[in-house]
Amino acid sequence: MIRTEEMLLNVGPQHPSTHGVFRLVIKIDGEIIKEATPVIGYLHRGTEKIAESLQYTQIIPYTDRMDYLSAMTNNYVICHAVETMMGLEIPERAEYLRVLAMELGRIASHLVWWGTNLLDIGAVSPFLYAFREREMIINLLNELCGARLTFNYMRVGGVKWDAPDGWIEKVEEFVPYMREQLAGYHDLVSGNEIFLNRVKGVGIYSAEEAISYSLSGANLRCTGVNWDLRKDEPYSIYDRFDFDIPVGSVGDAWDRYVCRMQEIEESLKIVEQAVQQFPKDGAVLAKVPKIIKAPKGEAFVRIESPRGEIGCYIASDGKKEPYRLKFRRPSFYNLQILPKLLKGENIANLITILGGVDIVLGEVDG
C-alpha cells in the first residue's frame, strides 16, 4: 500500500509573489494544499499608537506608508475624519485636486496589480507595459506634489499645493492615451486562452461569504454585490460625476480581474469629468489654525480605496493629538479569506489566488 506524507512548506517571508514581507505556511499532500496559515506582522510599525503622540498634520506622512501603492486615498481618509469633526468646508478647487489625485492613484495602483499579477503567473511583457503607463501617472503626481510614492499632499482643509501651470492639460492628454493602452491590454491578455485557463473557476467564493469575511472593493464586487462608497455613500464631490460600478457574478479570479480592469476605465471617466469641471481659480486650503485641535468627541469616516473600504476612527479630547486613532485597513480584512480559498487547491493556483486578492503588506500590518 502506498503511503503519502504531508509536507510543511514556507512561502516567504521574502518571496517575489508576495510584494512585501509576508509568510504563508502551507501544508501540502503531493500538489494539493491541505491547510494555509498566513503569518503577518513583519511590517508592523505601530502607526496607530505613534499617532497618539503626533499632531494631526504630522500623522499624514504615516498614512502614506500603509498602502504605499495608493497613498493619496490614505492621506484623504485621515484629513476627512478631522474635517468631519471640525465641520470644515473644503474649497472647490481643493476638492477637484483631491479627486484627480486619488483617481490617478487608483489607476496607478491597478496598473501595478495588473503587471505584477501577470508576471507572477508567467507573463513578462504586461509587467513592462503596466509600469510604462504607471510612470506617466507618477510623473504627473510628482509635478503636483513633489513626490513619487509617499506624497504627503493632503492637508486638513484642502491640499498643500495648487496644480502647476499646464498640469490639468497634461492630465487631459493622458486620458485618451490610457484608454488606447487599456484596449491593448485586453487584446494582449484578457482573451488569451492560457491566461483564461489560469483564472476562470479559480478561487471562487459567494457573496454571502464575502460579506461574512468583511471583504470590500473588487473582492466584494466580484461576487455580484454592487457596493462602492463613491456611489453608495458619496464623499468629497463624487456625486457630481457620472460613472458605473463594475460587478462580477461568479466570484472567481477572472471576475476580480475584470472588475479591476473596468475600474481603470471608470476612473478615467471621473478624471475626464473632473478636468472639464475644474474651477479656473480659487483657494486650495480652507482657513484653519496653524495647530489643529479637533473638538472633543469622536468620528468615523470611510472611503473607497483601490483595495476596498478604508476607514478612520478618531476619538478626541480636544487636544492637538488624537486620544485614540484607528484605521480600518481593507487589505487586512481581505486577507482573512485566503486560507479558505487555498484549502483543497492545487499549489500551482496559490499565486493566482494570492495575486487576485491584491493585498499590500504595509496596510495589512499597520
UniProtKB/Swiss-Prot annotation:
<comment type="function">
    <text>NDH-1 shuttles electrons from NADH, via FMN and iron-sulfur (Fe-S) centers, to quinones in the respiratory chain. The immediate electron acceptor for the enzyme in this species is believed to be a menaquinone. Couples the redox reaction to proton translocation (for every two electrons transferred, four hydrogen ions are translocated across the cytoplasmic membrane), and thus conserves the redox energy in a proton gradient.</text>
</comment>
<keyword id="KW-1003">Cell membrane</keyword>
<comment type="similarity">
    <text>Belongs to the complex I 49 kDa subunit family.</text>
</comment>
<keyword id="KW-0874">Quinone</keyword>
<keyword id="KW-0520">NAD</keyword>
<dbReference type="GO" id="GO:0005886">
    <property type="term" value="C:plasma membrane"/>
</dbReference>
<keyword id="KW-0472">Membrane</keyword>
<dbReference type="Pfam" id="PF00346">
    <property type="entry name" value="Complex1_49kDa"/>
</dbReference>
<dbReference type="InterPro" id="IPR001135">
    <property type="entry name" value="NADH_Q_OxRdtase_suD"/>
</dbReference>
<dbReference type="GO" id="GO:0051287">
    <property type="term" value="F:NAD binding"/>
</dbReference>
<dbReference type="InterPro" id="IPR029014">
    <property type="entry name" value="NiFe-Hase_large"/>
</dbReference>
<comment type="subunit">
    <text>NDH-1 is composed of 14 different subunits. Subunits NuoB, C, D, E, F, and G constitute the peripheral sector of the complex.</text>
</comment>
<protein>
    <recommendedName>
        <fullName>NADH-quinone oxidoreductase subunit D</fullName>
        <ecNumber>7.1.1.-</ecNumber>
    </recommendedName>
</protein>
<dbReference type="GO" id="GO:0048038">
    <property type="term" value="F:quinone binding"/>
</dbReference>
<dbReference type="InterPro" id="IPR022885">
    <property type="entry name" value="NDH1_su_D/H"/>
</dbReference>
<dbReference type="GO" id="GO:0050136">
    <property type="term" value="F:NADH:ubiquinone reductase (non-electrogenic) activity"/>
</dbReference>
<keyword id="KW-0813">Transport</keyword>
<keyword id="KW-1278">Translocase</keyword>
